[in-house]
Amino acid sequence: MDMKQALNRIASNLDLSRDEMKDVMRIVMNGEATDAQIGAFLMGLRLKSETIDEITGATEVMRELATGVTVNAEPLVDIVGTGGDGANLFNVSSAASFVVAAAGGYVAKHGNRGVSSKSGSADLIEKAGINLNMKPEEVARCVEQIGVGFMFAPAHHGAMKHAIGPRRELGCRTIFNILGPMTNPAGVTRQLIGVFTRELCRPMAEVLQRLGAEHIMVVCSKDGLDEISLATVTHVAELKDGEITEYDLTPEDLGIKSQSLVGLSVDGADESLALIKAAFGRSHDETTEKARDMIALNAGAAIYVAGLARTAKEGVDMALDAMGSGLAAGKMSELADFSQCF
């Protein structure tokens, strides 16, 4: 299928098959489509709503064209969000990555700079003194030896450059906003994924089910966070043993008291890093305790997804231990030191 055929199909409110979507995505990612065609394609998909087949095909092509990272370590997991929730919270998923590593997991963290937020995961990682410009084999060594490594998305998805202009000019969410979390360059099959709307929870779980994922939790909280929230109910679509189940979680279900998010918003990577370091330390003021609990909720779920705990609640206990013992702070320092060797 060529670009004009695809645009005519979408303009008629007709869906593309998985293979047709792969054809069109290759045209886009190989630089063979004009900016006008890419913009029309992205907006047309959004207006008619992307199907499971279309998202699956697009994900396959992004994975196919990515610069991969081969990691020889298990259990390998990622904690990632779509972004776009507008809450400007500190970098919960990045903080949780160090906690999971401290609990015995291996985290291949995939992320980018902030677009809608004031501190994206890459901004935080860089501020922590961690080298963003590593080769794939160097990232793999970080994961294997430290337990955590960071893959800077633009370095692994070079073909995305062809869509940057049209995406920026459109200025709204498109299919690319939901593809990032599903295109981890290390090929992880265990993930905690946060999304900006509950409507994406099950579709993303279904896409990853088709693509062979082992254990996935896709989450969105009632207050709109792409995280498990400390303040309210979080909706979950969980893929485990080949089956998808949907349910709601409260902080109390995981052994944590519900609390407001006041004090957890930040104005940039500096503030985010300071709050994470406090949470990893021995401070017991109210805001630090909230941050620690928020990290524990998400790290605990990831520890469970990694297979290191029988339940997410057990994972939360392990996460709190990893922070209280100083091991999580140690992982952050170790990665900063080790990554600067390259």
Curated annotation (Swiss-Prot):
One Pfam family cited in the UniProt record for this chain: Glycos_transf_3
UniProtKB keywords: Amino-acid biosynthesis, Aromatic amino acid biosynthesis, Glycosyltransferase, Magnesium, Metal-binding, Transferase, Tryptophan biosynthesis
InterPro entries: Anthranilate_Pribosyl_Tfrase (IPR005940), Glycosyl_Trfase_fam3 (IPR000312), Glycosyl_Trfase_fam3_N_dom (IPR017459), Glycosyl_Trfase_fam3_N_dom_sf (IPR036320), Nuc_phospho_transferase (IPR035902)
Pathway connected to this protein: Amino-acid biosynthesis; L-tryptophan biosynthesis; L-tryptophan from chorismate: step 2/5
Binding partners and assembly: Homodimer.
Family to which this protein belongs: Belongs to the anthranilate phosphoribosyltransferase family.
Cofactor note: Binds 2 magnesium ions per monomer.
Annotated Mg(2+) 2 binding sites: D226, E227
Stored NCBIfam families: trpD
Binding site for anthranilate 2: R167
UniProt-recorded Gene Ontology molecular function terms: anthranilate phosphoribosyltransferase activity; magnesium ion binding
A GO CC annotation given for this chain: cytosol
Enzyme class per UniProt: transferase
The name this protein goes by in its record: Anthranilate phosphoribosyltransferase
Taxonomic source organism: Marinobacter nauticus (strain ATCC 700491 / DSM 11845 / VT8)
Residues noted as binding anthranilate 1 in the record, renumbered to the chain: G81, N112
Residues that coordinate or bind Mg(2+) 1: S93, E227
Gene Ontology BP, a term: L-tryptophan biosynthetic process
Catalytic activity, reaction form: N-(5-phospho-beta-D-ribosyl)anthranilate + diphosphate = 5-phospho-alpha-D-ribose 1-diphosphate + anthranilate
Function description: Catalyzes the transfer of the phosphoribosyl group of 5-phosphorylribose-1-pyrophosphate (PRPP) to anthranilate to yield N-(5'-phosphoribosyl)-anthranilate (PRA).
Positions of 5-phospho-alpha-D-ribose 1-diphosphate binding: 81, 84-85, 91-94, 109-117, 121
Named cofactor requirement(s): Mg(2+)
Enzyme nomenclature, EC number: 2.4.2.18
